[in-house]
Each structure stands twice: as structure tokens, then as C-alpha cells.
UniProtKB/Swiss-Prot annotation:
Residues 1-10, 21-31 have a biased composition (Polar residues). This is Stress response protein NST1. Belongs to the NST1 family. Residues 263-273, 513-527, 661-670, 679-806 have a biased composition (Basic and acidic residues). It comes from Scheffersomyces stipitis (strain ATCC 58785 / CBS 6054 / NBRC 10063 / NRRL Y-11545). InterPro entries: NST1. Residues 161-175, 929-941, 1214-1227 have a biased composition (Low complexity). Residues 555-587, 596-605 have a biased composition (Acidic residues). It is found in: Cytoplasm. Residues 39-51 have a biased composition (Basic residues). Keywords: Coiled coil, Cytoplasm, Stress response. May act as a negative regulator of salt tolerance. Its main location: cytoplasm. Residues 1-70, 149-175, 246-283, 513-608, 661-816, 924-945, 1214-1234 are annotated as: Disordered.
Length: 1234
């Protein structure tokens, strides 16, 4: 192999990468090209001995790995990084492969680092410290297993050197130095035996192990733990090493020839595992073992002159030797147990073989010396055993052991051989009490206890099973010695009342102190840096008899039974692994000689337990060391990470500051540009503003001109409006003056009427007192409700009355003028009639003739006049026949009849019914006014004048129904869809289509411009007025009083011969009959029935009472009399038409039977037109209607207290009201009256 630099690199599971360099060159050989594997290994071993550790230096510290490398995985799972062109590195790597397993921070750390670890331990809190010192089974087992693997690999490497002359198969099998384990039967059997023994030890002596750990150093004292970790157990190693050295020195002085047998290790056996008696031949010299141990245990090369390095190497050697000795003793014990159970004499044979091997030539003198030496040591051992018996007797755990012993099973087993032994076990409870109170016991109790122990020892010595607490090579000799010791102990205890016992305890304490001082001296000489202040207190510790009770010692370990079981398993496994390691070291070191069996017999049970305790203590301390190391590494890693983070943050902050500076500079540049741009924009804005200012000035001038023009127009408009307002105010003022005059005149008239009415009331009060009393009670209840409605209607009616009175006043004035102008017309007509009395034809209707002649042409409207209806003389029955039936009928004056026929008497029946106050003003003066009665038949009528045309058309124009509904569809015009409550007036009276004579081109009285004589009548002759008139009395002469303004006779004056009527109902019936007759004569009937509104208007005109309501008319017509009234209803149950007949002995003679068509009679008989002949439900009947005197209706229409005032709007209002007669009217949309 060429001379190359031995450079190996290693990377292990997250640890740092370590490089080691060796500058020594390996000499090349020119021997055979294929040397044996044993020679190579010997050369490597020699090289290892001469190799000296040097300080590590890195050629390229910045490189993480070599440039040419191979990454491999070791058998234990480690990752290995090697160079490609270095073949020797692989072999050197095998020697250093497991150096991390033996590395701990205290072996390689300097004093400064140890101080850092101590300060780190002190900085931890209580919980972290408790977590670090907690015994973990898994962790301890891992430590044992790692050491076992390392020792196995090292053991197989040395075994290959010792068996180089074996067969070819064995040589090939051992050629691989890195074999992790052996597959032979003996290795497996040995491992199994060791595991079982460790389990036994752990199960039976776990408390002793823990006691020992606490005895060395109180683990619960967390502040003292660094002293334990940094040197507490090394003191134990020094003590053990000193004892072993003394024994070896004595053994070498006594047997110097035994060293010669170690030079030929290849004489006996083919395999180191097959022959256990020859395993001592394969050991290496002690110096070479120590050298290899130091080499393997030094992971990092340190400086040559360093005090810490020397101390660490020294501690490593002590630790390795201690472990190897413990494992050798454990293996010897196992072999002794196997020999005892299988062949009791095997141990003697083995001792003989060992003596033969160690003493060739049969040197009996040396053997005799050796036996004498052993006898002396046995005597010393007896003395030490006596002391141990005291300690055992005073041990507080003896009580627990006795409590756990099941004496019943012992009785049933082979231990009990006689009745005395059975009785002995029966007194076990007494023994327990004696042991518990041993410190307070007297001599008798101590004698009983000692005698009991002697008997127990005799039982176990005679039995097949040895005493479990003391297992030696010769149990029978031990039992005899034990009996002797007990006897001596009893004798010493009984002497001087126990003073000898106290002296013995003091001597034990002094010997322990001297031993501790002896151990401390060489440590201080070698290295003072490792002296711990806690070790000075070891001399003050009490003896085993004064050790704390278990309840105080094991506070940390008494959490639960499960924890103790886990801990026992951990320590068991640890002891198992460590036993394997020590066994391997035993084979490597070859520390046995021919006197091994004699030395083993000297080792007592307590010493073996001491070794086991130390072994577990070492493992526990290793566990604590690794935990503290890992915690410290984590802390360092966190600190470095935090520092790195801080550095990164600082760098990031610096970077951000630089960026901020750049941004600020950019912002400044941008701000400068922005300011320049703003300056340019401001200049531009100034120019634009100047231009805008000029444009605004022009606009303002234009607007000023426009505003001036508008102002002028507004001023002109305001002037016109002011003038118009002035004109309107003047008109209003004139109207107000006119209204005042009219109101004054009306007040006078009302006062006069009130006086008349009061007189009438006084006359009638006595007669109607009883009736009124009854009615008053009912009226009082209803008046309260009427009062409310009256107040509402009064305000509205007052406004309407003012307007209508004004209009009526103007109309009256115009009528008065017309009457004055046509005052001479009746005189002329009378003269004509008187002049030709013989020419009167009885078949002619003189009344109609007079009415037709007297009709003023000014009343006719612009509408087209229908052609005249030709009446035959037979169409009208004789008046005498009528007068014979009708008792005394009020005659109707020509003016009144003309007014009725032409519509002047009732211009609008609907308005007449709605506004009762205006109806009085619309009547002719002869019926309603006390002023001078002017004749309306003057040809110089002012009704045709332009000024009064609009007023006349508004007053006399018929008001049609809004709904346009009519059962006959003759005179109605559909206009709008109004409610049902709007009545179809059908206004035939107000219509000009029913004029009897209407020829536009014909001359006559209807044409105001005609020049024909008034004597020409429609019948071509003039009736003789000298005869009796149709009214049965002579008309008064009107010629003489025409100019003087004589008033026309009123209705009261036209009935001088008439007797008073029986009741008011009869008066209303007579008026209704006369009105029906006039409508029949004027051909205004509709299918033989008179429209209700026309009939109602005529009745009010005849009676001169505008306060009369439709309900009163219908109730009066429904009462029994000589007249028979038939009502015709529409689909809504409203009365629309009335038919009047006579009730003459059951024979009804219709006044219109000859004039009505036959089709009408058939239609009325069969009700084909949908008319009803019977009243619908809800109409007033005879039973519900009382007779009301006529005087009840003669009230002033302007009187607010009139009981009939509320009945004026019954048919048009929708409110429930009650009239003066007690008739209820709900005002619904179904009918005009109910």
C-alpha cells in the first residue's frame, strides 16, 4: 500500500462532522501478495499500539466534505463519509467506528466546558432537573446495548488473532473483523444465562441497588448532581482499582511463574467460546489492554501537555477496568452456579486444571504457599463476615424480607425435615417483631433472634438449595462458618452488656473513614481539578445501620408499582448488556490465572452486590450525563439559532434601512418633479382662469341684459295682474253690497214669515199638543243626531244659499220686469175671449190653448223643437166629469200651468229637491212672493237678452243622471259611470222637446217676431171668456191693475168656495192627482206613468211648500183615499214612475187610458219592461207613515230650526237621517228615498 495520508471523515445522525489526520506513513512490504488475515491484523494491532493521538487540524476548514468521497452506512446505522483513493482509511475507521458510543462530554470536555455545563444545570428550573434525573428504562437499555455491540465487535477482532492456526473454515469465519455477533451455540447460551441472572439480580436486589446509588450521592439533591456527574463515580472506580491492584500485586509476589503462561495463547482450544476453561489464555497483557482502551476511548485528540486530557485518560482506564472486573465476577458466579447444580465436583476439577496450567512442573511449594495465603484471607473474611452479619441484622430491610417470606410454602417444601424445624418456622412472627424492635431489644430478645438465625442457617445448609443470600463455591463450609460467626456474634453481644457491640460499630466507622481518605489522596496528587466538594462529606456518612428508612430515601421512586417494575426491567437489561461487555473484555484481557477458583471463593455476596450496584450506578450516571449533554446541546443550538435569527434580523433591518434611504431619495426626486409639474400646472391654470374670467364677464353682461328684459316683462305682467285684481276686487265689492241688500231684504221677509208661522203655531198648538207630546219624545232622541248633521249641512247650505239667493234675486228682478211688461197680456186675452163667446167649442181644451198661447218664446232653448202633437177632442175627458169625482180641486192659473209645462216653475227638479231654499225663489210671484205680480207672458221678455242667456241656461238646463240609467231609455243620455245613488231625473218638464207647438217657420204666439194677431188661437176660434171658466169661478179682471202693479191672486185666494180638506195626506194626494193630470194633458207621461221627479216638482209648486220631501209624498200617496197610486220600481228597488187612478166602487178608471198606446198597457200589465208593480222591501208603507198636517210643512226655508230642513238632501246624501215625521232614511246607494 502506498504512503497516503490517513484522512477519515464521519457524519453521524445530526452531530458535527469530525476529521482526524495521521501523518505516520505505513511501510510497504514485498512479501507474498496474499498474506494471511491474522498477520494483517497483528500488524494493525502493532500500529495501533505505537499510534499517538495528535491535535486535529483541517486543511480546508471551509469545505464540508472531501472533494472525492463515498457515503456509506456502518452496521450500527451510522453514516460514514470516506475518501475514494484512501484504502487504509476503511481499516482505520473500524478502530474508531464506535468512538461516539463511548464519548461523553465529561471525557472530552475541558474545565471551562464543565463549568459551563454546571452553570447550565444551575440555570434549569426544578421540573427540568427532575426530568433529567428521572431513571428511564429505555434509555438505560440503549446504553447497555450500545456498549454490548462495541464490545462484541472488539471481542471478535481479538478472537481472530488468537485463533490464526485453526482450520481453514474457522480462519475464513474470523477474517471479517467487523462481524457484529457470533452464531455459535455457546454465545447464545451464555447470553441467555447472563440475561436470566441479571433478571434475578434486578428482581431481588433492586432496592439494594437504589440504596447504593443514594448512598454514593443523593440523587434527589438536584444541586449536588453536577458533582456526581463530574467525579462522583470516579472515586468509586479509584477505590475499586486500588483494591484490585493490591490483590494482583500480592498474587504476583506469591506466584511470579504464573505470568509465563500468557505467552502462548494458541495452545489450547479452537474457538474461544467452545472451551470455557481456556478463556483466560486469550487475554492480552494489562498494559496493552490499557493502551487500547485509552486509544478507543479518546474520540477527539487533545494536546499532549493538557492536565484535563491526562485526567480524562486516567478516568477512562479506571472506568473500563471496573466494568471488566464486574463482568468477570458475574461470569464466575454463573459458572459456579452451573457447576453446583450439575456436577458438585466440577469446580474441584477446574481448580486442579487451572493449578496445573498455572504451575507447570508441579511446583508444590508454591501451591502450599498459595493455600496458606488463602487460609489467612479466609480468616480475615470471617472477621469481615461477622461485621456484615451485624449489618444484616440491623438492616431495616430485613423486616421487609421476612414479611415477604412465605413460611407456609417453606413448611410444605423440602426445607422442613423434622418437628423441631416446623416449630421453628411457627415462631417466625415473633422473629419479625424482634427484628423490628432490634434497637430497643434487650439481651433475651437478641439471644432469641440469634438462635433463630442459627437454626435457619442449619436448615438451609442441610437442604438441597443453598442459602439465597450467600452463594459461594462451597455452601457447606459457608454454612458452618456462618454458624460459627453467629455464635461468636452472640457471645460478643452478651459480653459487657453489649459494650463490645458498640465498640465494633465504632471500629467499622473508623475503617470506612480511613478507606475514604486513602482513596482521596492519590486523586488529589494526580489531578486537583477533579476534586469535588461533595466528596469531603463521605466520611461523615453514617454506617449501614444508620441509613435512612426507605420511605425517606425513595421519595422520587415511589410514584407507583408500575414505575418500579419498569425501572427493574431497565436495570435488568442494563445489567444484561453490561454483563456481555464485561464478558467480552474478560476474554480480551485474560485476567484469570490458575488461582481463579480460590479467589472466587473469597468473594462474598456483599462484594458481588457492591460490584453490581456500581455497575448500575455507572449506567445511571451515564444516562444523566447524556441527558444533560443533549439538553446542553439543545440549549446551545437554540442560543445559536436565536443569535442567527438576530443576526439575520439585523441584516434584514440594515437592508430595509438601505432600501428606505433609496426610497427616500426616489421620493425626493419625485417630489421635485412633482413640484415642477405643479408650477407648470399653476401657470396653465392661471391662464385658463383669466380666459374664464373674460368669458364670465361676457356671460354676466348677457345675463344682465336678459335679466333686465325679464324684469321689464315681469313688471308689465305685475301691472296687468294688479289691474286685474283691482277689477276683481271691485266686482267682489259690488257683489258684497248686493248680497248685503239681498240679505237685508230676506231678513225682512223671514221675519214676516216667522210672525205668520208663530200665529199659526199658536192656533194649532192646542189642537196638536197631545200629538206633539208623543212626537217630541221621539224627536228629542233623533234631534241630537240631526243636530250634528244639521250643523255640517248648515255651513254648506249657507254658502250655497248665498250664491243661489244672489242668482234668484237677479232672476226675480228680471221676472218682475217681464211681468210689468206683460201685465196687459191677460187683459187682452180676456177681452178676446169675451168678444167671441159663441165661438167657444166644448170639444176643445181651452186650458191647453191658453197655455200654448201664453207660453213665452224666450223660454225655449236652442234645441230643436219636436213637431206639435195633434190632440183630438176625444183625448181629454170633460172637466165636468172630473169635477164630479174630485171634491174641490185647487185651480191652476195660466201662469202656473205654463210654468209647469215649460219648465219655468221648476227649472231643475233635482236642484229643487236638493236645495229647498232656492225652490221658493223659483216659483212665480203669484204663488210665492208678496211683491207685485208681473205677467211672464210679455213679448218683451228679457229672458232672451244676451246678458241673461247664460244664467237662464244654467238655471233651467235639465240635470241628467251621471249613471245614465233609465228603464225606458227615452230621455236619458249615458254620460259617466256614477254611483247608484245618483238619480235619473229624466227631466221631461225641463226639456224643450215636448213643446206642443214648435214650428220654426210658423207664426204664432211662440214666435216673438210674429205680426199676427194674438186672437188667432191654435183652434182657429177664440173661446168666450164670459162664460163660466174651467175652474168654476170667474177670473178677476187684470186690465185695470196691470199698470198699478196689482198682485196676482195666490193659491189661497183661488179657492174661495173650497172647503178645508180632511187631512194633509188628502191635500198632497189632490195635488199629486192635479199634477198627474197636467202631465197627461201636456203629453209628458212615459208609458202611462208620470216620472216621479216631475210629479214631485209639480206637487211642491201646487202646495207652495218647498220643504216637502219625496218620502212624505210617497207615504201620503200610499194611504187610503179616493185615489189609487201605483209605483213603478227599477232594478235597484227605487221608485221611478207613478200611476194615478180613481177608486170608485172598485172600478178604476185611468185618466190616460185613451191617450196611452195599447202597447204600453200590455207592457205595464205583463211587466215586460222589468218594472215592478209592488213596492220592493224597505219602502215606506201605510203603517209606517203617519199623517202630517199641512201646517207642518209651512216653515221658512231659511229657518235653521226647521225640522224639515234636514230632509232636503235625503235622496242625494249617503248619511242616515231622520225627517221630522220620523221617517228614516239611510241614504244608501240603492235609492233616492227609502
Amino acid at each position: 500500500m502506498s504512503d497516503t495520508t490517513d484522512s477519515t471523515s464521519r457524519f453521524r445522525l445530526g452531530d458535527d462532522i469530525h476529521f482526524s489526520y495521521d501523518n505516520q506513513s505505513q511501510p510497504t512490504t514485498s512479501e507474498s501478495p496474499a498474506p494471511s488475515s491474522s498477520n494483517k491484523k497483528k500488524k494493525k494491532k502493532a500500529n495501533k499500539k505505537h499510534k499517538q493521538p495528535v491535535e486535529a487540524t483541517l486543511n480546508n476548514p471551509e469545505d464540508d466534505y472531501p472533494t472525492s468521497r463515498v457515503i456509506k452506512q456502518a452496521p450500527n446505522g451510522d453514516v460514514i463519509v470516506e475518501s475514494l483513493d484512501d484504502e487504509a482509511s476503511h481499516q482505520n475507521q473500524e478502530n474508531h467506528r464506535h468512538h461516539h458510543q463511548y464519548t461523553n462530554i465529561w471525557d472530552s470536555a475541558s474545565i471551562e466546558e464543565q463549568e459551563n455545563l454546571k452553570s447550565f444545570w444551575e440555570s434549569l428550573d426544578e421540573s427540568s432537573k427532575m426530568e433529567l434525573v428521572k431513571i428511564d428504562k429505555k434509555s438505560i437499555m440503549e446504553i447497555f446495548k450500545n456498549e454490548t455491540k462495541a464490545n462484541n465487535q472488539s471481542h471478535h477482532g481479538h478472537g481472530a488473532n488468537g485463533t490464526s492456526s485453526a482450520s481453514g473454515a474457522n480462519s475464513a469465519a474470523n477474517a471479517n473483523p467487523v462481524t457484529p455477533s457470533c452464531a455459535c451455540k455457546y454465545c447464545g447460551r451464555r447470553s441467555t444465562i447472563i440475561e436470566d441472572e441479571l433478571e434475578n439480580i434486578y428482581d431481588n436486589h433492586f432496592d439494594d441497588i437504589i440504596d447504593f446509588i443514594h448512598e454514593i450521592r443523593d440523587i434527589n439533591d438536584l444541586n449536588a448532581l453536577p458533582g456526581l456527574l463530574f467525579g462522583g463515580f470516579h472515586m468509586l472506580e479509584e477505590e475499586h482499582k486500588l483494591q484490585k491492584r493490591q490483590q494482583r500485586m500480592k498474587h504476583k509476589r506469591d506466584h511470579p511463574a504464573s505470568q509465563n503462561h500468557t505467552e502462548n495463547p494458541e495452545v489450547h482450544g479452537e474457538h474461544p467460546h467452545v472451551q470455557p476453561q481456556n478463556f483466560v489464555n486469550s487475554r492480552a497483557p494489562a498494559d496493552s489492554i490499557n493502551t487500547s482502551v485509552v486509544d478507543n476511548r479518546t474520540p477527539y485528540p487533545v494536546a499532549a501537555g493538557s492536565i484535563g486530557a491526562k485526567q480524562l485518560q486516567h478516568q477512562q482506564q479506571l472506568q473500563q477496568q471496573l466494568q471488566q472486573q464486574q463482568l468477570r465476577q458475574l461470569q464466575q458466579q454463573l459458572q459456579q452456579e452451573q457447576n453446583v447444580h450439575s456436577q458438585p465436583q466440577q469446580s474441584l476439577q477446574m481448580q486442579q486444571q487451572l493449578n496445573e496450567n498455572d504451575l507447570p512442573g508441579g511446583n508444590t511449594s508454591d501451591l502450599a504457599k498459595h493455600l496458606e495465603k488463602m487460609s489467612l484471607e479466609d480468616k480475615k473474611g470471617e472477621y469481615t463476615n461477622e461485621r456484615k452479619i451485624f449489618q444484616k441484622l440491623l438492616d431495616p430491610k430485613l423486616v421487609e424480607v421476612l414479611d415477604k417470606v412465605d413460611f407456609e410454602k417453606v413448611k410444605s417444601g423440602n426445607y422442613v425435615g423434622s418437628a423441631s424445624q416446623a416449630n421453628l418456622f411457627q415462631r417466625a412472627d415473633c422473629l419479625r417483631e424482634i427484628v423490628r424492635d432490634l434497637h430497643k431489644a434487650d439481651k433475651t430478645q437478641l439471644e432469641q433472634g440469634l438462635s433463630f438465625l442459627k437454626n435457619i442457617s442449619s436448615i438451609f445448609s442441610n437442604s438441597k438449595t443453598p442459602f439465597p443470600a450467600d452463594v459461594t463455591s462451597n455452601p457447606r463450609n459457608f454454612s458452618s462458618k456462618f454458624n460459627d460467626q453467629l455464635s461468636n456474634f452472640a457471645e460478643d453481644l452478651l459480653k459487657n452488656d453489649g459494650n463490645s457491640f458498640i465498640e465494633m460499630m465504632e471500629s467499622l466507622s473508623e475503617s470506612r473513614t480511613a478507606r475514604e481518605d486513602l482513596l482521596k489522596d492519590p486523586t488529589k496528587k494526580d489531578a486537583q481539578a477533579w476534586v469535588d466538594e461533595d466528596d469531603n462529606n463521605d466520611s461523615k456518612r453514617p454506617d449501614a445501620s444508620t441509613v435512612k428508612q426507605p420511605s425517606q430515601e425513595y421519595e422520587y421512586y415511589e410514584e407507583s408499582e408500575e414505575d418500579e417494575e419498569e425501572l427493574s426491567e431497565e436495570d435488568e437489561d442494563d445489567a444484561d448488556d453490561n454483563g456481555l461487555n464485561e464478558d467480552d473484555d474478560l476474554v480480551q484481557d485474560g485476567h484469570h490465572d490458575d488461582s481463579a477458583s480460590d479467589t472466587e471463593s473469597e468473594i462474598s455476596e456483599e462484594e458481588k452486590m457492591q460490584e453490581i450496584r456500581r455497575l448500575f450506578l455507572i449506567q445511571v450516571i451515564k444516562l444523566f450525563q447524556e441527558r444533560l449533554k443533549s439538553a446542553y446541546k439543545e440549549k446551545l443550538s437554540e442560543d445559536r439559532t436565536q443569535k442567527l435569527i438576530e443576526e439575520l434580523e439585523a441584516e434584514e433591518n440594515a437592508k430595509k434601512e438601505r432600501e428606505l434611504k433609496k426610497l427616500k431619495q426616489k421620493e425626493k426626486a419625485k417630489e421635485k418633479k412633482r413640484l415642477q409639474q405643479l408650477a407648470k400646472e399653476e401657470e396653465k391654470k392661471k391662464k385658463e382662469e383669466e380666459q374664464r374670467a373674460k368669458e364670465e364677464e361676457l356671460k354676466q353682461k348677457q345675463e344682465a341684459l336678459k335679466a333686465d328684459q325679464r324684469r321689464r316683462k315681469e313688471e308689465a305682467k305685475l301691472k296687468r295682474e294688479e289691474e286685474k285684481k283691482k277689477r276683481i276686487e271691485e266686482l267682489k265689492r259690488k257683489e258684497e253690497e248686493h248680497k248685503k241688500k239681498v240679505e237685508a231684504q230676506q231678513k225682512k221677509e223671514e221675519e214676516a214669515k216667522k210672525l205668520k208661522e208663530e200665529r199659526k203655531k199658536k192656533a194649532e198648538e192646542e189642537r196638536k199638543k197631545k200629538e206633539e207630546e208623543k212626537r217630541q219624545k221621539e224627536l228629542l232622541k233623533k234631534q241630537k243626531e240631526e243636530e250634528r248633521e244639521r250643523l255640517k249641512l248648515e255651513a254648506e247650505e249657507n254658502e250655497r244659499l248665498e250664491k243661489e239667493q244672489q242668482e234668484l234675486q237677479e232672476l226675480q228682478e228680471s221676472q218682475n220686469q217681464l211681468e210689468l211688461e206683460s201685465a196687459q197680456l191677460p187683459a187682452e186675452l180676456a177681452e178676446e175671449i169675451n168678444a167671441s163667446p159663441d165661438s167657444f167649442s166644448p170639444t176643445k181644451n181651452h186650458l191647453l190653448e191658453q197655455l200654448y198661447q201664453a207660453r213665452p218664446s224666450s223660454v225655449s232653448g236652442p234645441t230643436t223643437i219636436s213637431p206639435p202633437i195633434q190632440f183630438t177632442p176625444e183625448a181629454v175627458p170633460p172637466v165636468a166629469a172630473v169635477s164630479s169625482v174630485v171634491p174641490s180641486v185647487v185651480p191652476i192659473s195660466p201662469a202656473l200651468s205654463g210654468a209647469i209645462l215649460n219648465g219655468t216653475g221648476s227649472p231643475n227638479s233635482r236642484n229643487a229637491m236638493l236645495y229647498g231654499s232656492s225652490a221658493q225663489a223659483q216659483l212665480p210671484n203669484g204663488l210665492n212672493s208678496s211683491t207685485s205680480n208681473m205677467s211672464p207672458w210679455s213679448s218683451k221678455s228679457r229672458l232672451n237678452s244676451t246678458s241673461g242667456a247664460s244664467l237662464q241656461s244654467n238655471l233651467f238646463q235639465p240635470q241628467l243622471s251621471a249613471s245614465g240609467f233609465s228603464p225606458f231609455n227615452d230621455f236619458s243620455t249615458p254620460a259617466t259611470s256614477a254611483g247608484i245613488g245618483s238619480v235619473n231625473v229624466n227631466a221631461p218638464l225641463a226639456s224643450t222637446a215636448v213643446e206642443p207647438l214648435a214650428g220654426a217657420n210658423n207664426g204664432g204666439v211662440w214666435n216673438p217676431s210674429t205680426t199676427s194677431s194674438r186672437n188667432n188661437s191654435i183652434w182657429s176660434n177664440t173661446p168666450n171668456l164670459n162664460n163660466a171658466s174651467i175652474w168654476g169661478n170667474t177670473l178677476p179682471s187684470l186690465a185695470g191693475g196691470a199698470g198699478a202693479g196689482a198682485s196676482t191672486p195666490s193659491a189661497a185666494h183661488t179657492l174661495p168656495n173650497s172647503a178645508p180638506l180632511a187631512s194633509d195626506n188628502e191635500l198632497i194626494q189632490v195635488a199629486a192627482y192635479n199634477t198627474f193630470q197636467m202631465l197627461q194633458n201636456s203629453n209628458q207621461l212615459e208609458f202611462g206613468a208620470a216620472p216621479l221627479m216631475k210629479l214631485f216638482s209639480g206637487v211642491k209648486l201646487l202646495l207652495g211648500n218647498n220643504a216637502l220631501t219625496i218620502n212624505q209624498l210617497l207615504s201620503s200617496c200610499d194611504s187610503t183615499s179616493v185615489y189609487h197610486f201605483e209605483f213603478v220600481y227599477d232594478d235597484f228597488g227605487t221608485v221611478t214612475h207613478v200611476k194615478v187612478n180613481f177608486n170608485n166602487g172598485g172600478l178604476a178608471q185611468s185618466l190616460q187610458s185613451q191617450a196611452a198606446p195599447t202597447l204600453l198597457n200590455n207592457t205595464l200589465a205583463t211587466s215586460a219592461a222589468g218594472l215592478r208593480s209592488s213596492p220592493p222591501p224597505g219602502l215606506g208603507t201605510k203603517a209606517s207613515t203617519g199623517s202630517v198636517p199641512l201646517s207642518q210643512f209651512r216653515f221658512n226655508i231659511n229657518d235653521a230650526n226647521s225640522p224639515l230642513l234636514s230632509n232636503l238632501g235625503d235622496w242625494s246624501s249617503g248619511n242616515n237621517s231622520t225627517n221630522a215625521n220620523g221617517n228614516s232614511s239611510n241614504g244608501g246607494s240603492r235609492g233616492l228615498w227609502n
